[in-house]
Curated annotation (Swiss-Prot):
Subunit text: Homophilic and heterophilic interaction via its extracellular domain. Interacts with SCARF1. The heterophilic interaction with SCARF1, which is stronger than the homophilic interaction with itself, is suppressed by the presence of SCARF1 ligand such as Ac-LDL.
Gene: SCARF2
Disulfide bonds listed in the record: 75-86, 80-98, 100-109, 126-134, 128-141, 143-152, 156-163, 158-170, 172-181, 185-193, 187-200, 202-211, 215-222, 217-229, 231-240, 244-251, 246-258, 260-269, 376-384, 379-391, 393-402
Function field: Probable adhesion protein, which mediates homophilic and heterophilic interactions. In contrast to SCARF1, it poorly mediates the binding and degradation of acetylated low density lipoprotein (Ac-LDL).
Record-linked Gene3D superfamilies: Tie2 ligand-binding domain superfamily (2.170.300.10)
One GO BP: heterophilic cell-cell adhesion via plasma membrane cell adhesion molecules
Tissue specificity statement from the Swiss-Prot or TrEMBL entry: Predominantly expressed in endothelial cells. Expressed in heart, placenta, lung, kidney, spleen, small intestine and ovary.
Protein name: Scavenger receptor class F member 2
Length: 871
């Protein structure tokens, strides 16, 4: 190769029009004619976005660009035509541009690459050199003789043979054997040598160790060692000289018995398997071929399968979760996760107690178990469990058949709950407690009583609010009275309790008697220490009625009975009506005297038992001090105490006399218990008897009550005095007496009920006749005002009330007016107020004290013998 080498080859050359004509021109013309023939195969549609695909001017149809030919849906083949046609060893890489084929180089691509080069323009170096040659296109090595390996780097070790070019294994020449073909074979011409073992293998028709014996098997081979004939197909016998009669099978080589092929049976294997069977000896059953079609007798294949079956032999059910023809349907979900039937799609099985295509239906009543195949036993008052068949009892019964009632103390389902009743007598079904007849009545009565109490409380609250708003006596008060009223809050609170009692309905107590009343002054600053009248004993003489406004529910009691409060008017500075002047009373006498005399022991001033609610309420609400009364239950005293009181002898009553019935016309409308007293009347208290009186009980035999304790406290304290004021002109004597201020409190501790002891040590003592006359004047004034009130009420309409029985009246002789202590004028603003003419003030309804009652006849007789009631 002169001046030509692989490195000096030009890249590519362009054929010009003036080049020499190609020697391959006739062949190219033939190819062009073939290309111009109509194509019998429809060309593939071009991809508008493919390589070298263009659009013709004025058309939207894609076509290959100039110089390119279609290859698939693109234009990937370059075309070199005309003067640009490539030679035999050239390839067209671009339109009108040729390049040398791999393995060739030169100006005309007519020079083959040297052994050590390959590829385009012989630019790639061959790695097999010098023991092999590279392929021009791929560069794969082809080793020379006696060389092997990927790069022909290994030498072949076979002595009488060749090596495999990749593995190097030896291929021995005939007559040689061994790993490297180094051993020679010693076999006759009727045999060949085994290259691995070197043993001689006899040719067909020869047998023996040296393969020198010929077989006598009628052209059939024989065993190499024994020479026994190995008959060919369809022959049998010792020499393979008999013809086999089997139609679809093989004959036994000795006796010629037929061994039928699968799908046939019979002596000569002429009978195919019956429908539904296939295989060797027709022993296997066909699968679920559709429509009872027979399967192939040899393999058992079916043309189509029944619904729910799959496989070539239709012997495999549908996979889990599928069913139907061709196993193309998906099973709907079954209850409890069970699979569906591969043929019908229904659930294969259900849990005990459920049936249906989807196991969605419970067993009907009376059956239970799997597929509801079992019948329930009799469950009495219960029902059968649809799963287990066990009787489920209703509340109140138990047992295997639900026919046993719950024992006492238990209830509910299966009697599993304990009763919460006191005596375990509850309903076995609901557990409600059974009440006996008396218990039911008690519960009903308690409910009714509760309703009545609620109604009563609501009524009391309503009445209190209504009466407080309608009280005509409430009016604006001066600032000083308001300040004094704050100090007397306990007394007003006591009065409000009495107002509640006045709103209660009147309850007739026809078989009770009025109690005895003992009046004693209490300190104005005393704490809340009042109660109401004690209900008379039911064993005494019946009375027409007793005002329910005298409550028996609260306040203090003493050894002699309960204590109730009677408010009196305020002092001049504390008076509710500032327009009415008041006259202070003189200081009490130095020596106490009894309130009654033997001459007045036969009569007693009657005291009414009822009172007007509004007047009594207004009087109790006053800020002034209160008169307290004790209801003394008289006990049997010695004859000496019974016969004389305060040193005065009284003749005992010969017999107990029943008092005559009261006159309804003279019954007052206002009770002295709640009536408003004037300051003067309340202030003139009788003097107590001397300490040595036999009628006074011993101090050691008498308990100290809260009222006595308060009285004792005031007694040892500093004495309080009031400035006496003169009676204003024009004011009647009775009004003056009623308006007089209240004297200091008197205590009766240790001197018997009704005996008053002055606590004011500063003033002169008052005589007994003087005190008696003042008390009589007060009572006469109250009686007159009561009469005027009755006349006024009679004009409006009489109120019929049952009159209480009257006791024998004991009168107190009036004291001489000359003995009344003179009133001294008090200078100050009060005097200027009294100089003015006093306006006419409304008369207060002053009740009269009701005579007390005794519990027994002996007590009544003792009262008659004792004389007048102790005030």
């Amino acid at each position: 190769m002169e001046g030509a080498g692989p490195r000096g080859a030009g890249p590519a050359r362009r054929r010009g029009a003036g080049g020499p004509p190609s020697p391959l021109l006739p062949s190219l013309l033939l190819l062009l004619l073939l290309w111009m023939l109509p194509d019998t195969v429809a060309p593939q549609e071009l991809n508008p976005r493919g390589r070298n695909v263009c659009r013709a001017p004025g058309s939207q149809v894609p076509t290959c660009c100039a110089g390119w030919r279609q290859q698939g849906d693109e234009c990937g083949i370059a075309v070199c035509e005309g003067n640009s046609t490539c030679s035999e060893n050239e390839v067209c890489v671009r339109p009108g541009e040729c390049r040398c084929r791999h393995g060739y180089f030169g100006a005309n691509c007519d020079t083959k690459c040297p052994r050590q080069f390959w590829g385009p323009d012989c630019k790639e170096l061959c790695s097999c050199h010098p023991h092999g040659q590279c392929e021009d296109v791929t560069g794969q090595c082809t080793c020379h003789a006696r060389r092997w390996g990927a790069r022909c780097e290994h030498a072949c070790q076979c002595q009488h043979g060749t090596c495999h070019p990749r593995s190097g294994a030896c291929r021995c020449e005939p007559g040689w054997w061994g790993a490297q073909c180094a051993s020679a074979c010693y076999c006759s011409a009727t045999s060949r040598c085994d290259p691995q073992t070197g043993a001689c293998l006899c040719h067909a028709g020869w047998w023996g160790r040296s393969c020198n014996n010929q077989c006598a098997c009628n052209s059939s081979p024989c065993e190499q060692q024994s020479g026994r004939c190995q008959c060919r197909e369809r022959t049998f016998g010792a020499r393979c000289d008999r013809y086999c009669q089997c139609f679809r099978g093989r004959c036994h080589p000795v006796d010629g018995t037929c061994a039928c092929e699968p799908g046939y049976r019979g002596k000569y294997c002429r009978e195919p398997c019956p429908a539904g069977f296939y295989g060797l000896g027709c022993r296997r059953r066909c699968g679920q071929c559709k429509g009872q079609q027979p399967c192939t007798v040899a393999e058992g294949r079916c043309l189509t399968c029944e619904p729910g079956w799959n496989g070539t032999k239709c012997d495999q059910p549908c996979a889990t979760g599928f069913y139907g023809e061709g196993c193309s349907h998906r099973c709907p979900p079954c209850r409890d996760g069970h699979a569906c039937n591969h043929v019908t799609g229904k659930c294969t099985r259900c849990n005990a107690g459920w049936i249906g295509d989807r196991c969605e239906t419970k067993c009907s009543n009376g059956t239970y178990g799997e597929d509801c195949a079992f019948v329930c036993a009799d469950c009495g008052s219960g029902h059968c469990d649809f799963q287990s068949g066990r009787c489920l009892c209703s509340p109140g019964v138990h047992g295997p058949h639900c026919n046993v009632t719950c024992p006492p103390g238990l209830h509910g389902a299966d009697c599993a709950q304990a009763c919460s009743c006191h005596e375990d007598t509850c309903d076995p079904v609901t557990g409600a407690c059974h009440l006996e007849t008396n218990q039911r009545k008690g519960v009903m009565g308690a409910g009714a009583l509760l309703v009545l109490l609620v109604c009563l409380l609501l009524s009391l609250l309503g009445c209190c609010c209504a009466c407080r708003g309608k009280d005509p006596t409430r009016r604006p008060r001066p600032r000083r009275e308001l300040s004094l009223g704050r100090k007397k809050a306990p007394h007003r609170l006591c009065g409000r309790f009495s107002r509640i009692s006045m709103k209660l309905p009147r309850i007739p107590l026809r078989r009770q008697k009025l109690p005895k009343v003992v009046v004693a002054h209490h300190d104005l600053d005393n704490t809340l220490n009042c109660s109401f009248l004690e209900p008379p004993s039911g064993l005494e003489q019946p009375s027409p009625s007793w005002s329910s406004r005298a409550s028996f529910s609260s306040f203090d009691t003493t050894d002699e009975g309960p204590v109730y409060c009677v408010p009196h008017e305020e002092a001049p500075a504390e008076s509710r009506d500032p327009e009415v002047p008041t006259v202070p009373a003189e200081a009490p006498a130095p020596s106490p005297v009894p309130l009654t005399t033997p001459a007045s022991a036969e009569e007693a001033i009657p005291l009414p038992a009822s009172s007007d609610s509004e007047r009594s309420a207004s009087s109790v609400e006053g800020p002034g001090g209160a008169l307290y009364a004790r209801v003394a239950r008289r006990e049997a005293r010695p004859a000496r105490a019974r016969g004389e009181i305060g040193g005065l002898s009284l003749s005992p009553s010969p017999e107990r006399r029943k008092p005559p019935p009261p006159d309804p016309a003279t019954k007052p409308k206002v009770s002295w218990i709640h009536g408003k007293h004037s300051a003067a009347a309340a202030g003139r208290a009788p003097s107590p008897p001397p300490p040595g009186s036999e009628a006074a009980p011993s101090p050691s035999k008498r308990k100290r009550t809260p009222s006595d304790k308060s009285a004792h406290t005031v007694e040892h304290g500093s004495p309080r005095t009031r400035d006496p004021t003169p009676r204003p002109p024009g004011l009647p004597e009775e009004a003056t007496a009623l308006a007089a201020p209240s004297p200091p409190r008197a205590r009766a501790r240790g001197r018997g009920p009704g005996l008053l002891e002055p606590t004011d040590a500063g003033g002169p003592p008052r005589s007994a006749p003087e005190a008696a006359s003042m008390l009589a004047a007060e009572l006469r004034g109250k009686t007159r005002s009561l009469g005027r009130a009755e006349v006024a009420l009679g004009a409006q309409g009489p109120r019929e009330k049952p009159a209480p029985p009257q006791k024998a009246k004991r009168s107190v002789p009036p004291a001489s007016p000359a003995r009344a202590p003179p009133a001294t004028e008090t200078p100050g603003p009060e005097k200027a107020a009294t100089d003015l003419p006093a306006p006419e003030t409304p008369r207060k309804k002053t009740p009269i004290q009701k005579p007390p009652r005794k519990k027994s006849r002996e007590a009544a007789g003792e009262l008659g013998r004792a004389g007048a009631p102790t005030l």
